[in-house]
């Protein structure tokens, strides 16, 4: 079963990113430390099997930590783009707009989050078009049904681990201490059965009304 096509999303460069957490600075140029990238790639390889025959996609390549880790782990092919690449194996491009010559790939990334996940969710849904597995470092708000309801329904969450990252700068040095962000790494798998949308029953506790009839204002 394939979910109907979703409406087009804005490009990564077109989405206005507002400061919402300590990771968001301009174009969110904090990078995943290489040892952490290697650890997560190893986890993915163990989870999916046949890693040596797989194509790996890194949609926010940056300094190439995931690219190098995937290559060392033996991936058959690694494709990566970034709007401001900092590594020779990362191509210049907007992931939300570039063509992806892959099928049943594995997408591994620490994508840009954006305010209220305005970037991370479009990145996931774009990756879902060509992937069998997706492993993303994301805010822990991704555990909420309100976020997961916006993700491609063909994908099912198979693992979710807490993660606290000390981000690094373009030179691999520790970035500002305030950038520590409570995140998680989620592993998603494409399945033929659609994931159900979570619906919350309206208990009628709060109702929209006019100012004249309201009991309280928020």
Regions picked out by a protein language model, each given a short descriptive name:
Residues 1-218:
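Class I S-adenosyl-L-methionine-dependent methyltransferase catalytic core
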């Amino acid at each position: 079963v394939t979910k109907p096509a979703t409406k087009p999303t804005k490009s990564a460069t077109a989405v206005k990113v507002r400061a919402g957490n300590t990771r968001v600075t301009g174009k969110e140029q904090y990078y995943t430390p290489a040892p952490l990238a290697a650890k997560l790639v190893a986890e993915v390889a163990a989870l999916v099997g046949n890693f040596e025959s797989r194509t790996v996609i890194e949609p926010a390549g940056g300094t190439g930590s995931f690219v190098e880790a995937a290559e060392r782990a033996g991936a058959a092919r690694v494709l990566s783009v970034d709007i401001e690449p900092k590594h020779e194996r990362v191509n210049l491009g907007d992931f939300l707009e570039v063509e992806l010559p892959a099928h049943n790939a594995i997408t591994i990334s620490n994508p840009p989050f954006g305010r209220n996940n305005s970037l991370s969710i479009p990145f996931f849904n774009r990756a879902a078009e060509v992937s069998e597995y997706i492993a993303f470092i994301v805010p822990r708000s991704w555990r909420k049904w309100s976020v997961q309801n916006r993700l491609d329904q063909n994908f099912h969450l198979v693992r979710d681990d807490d993660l606290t990252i000390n981000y690094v700068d373009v030179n691999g040095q520790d970035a500002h201490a305030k950038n520590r962000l409570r995140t998680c790494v989620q592993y998603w798998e494409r399945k033929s059965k659609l994931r159900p949308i979570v619906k919350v029953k309206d208990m009628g506790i709060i109702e929209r009304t006019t100012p004249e009839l309201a009991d309280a204002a928020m």
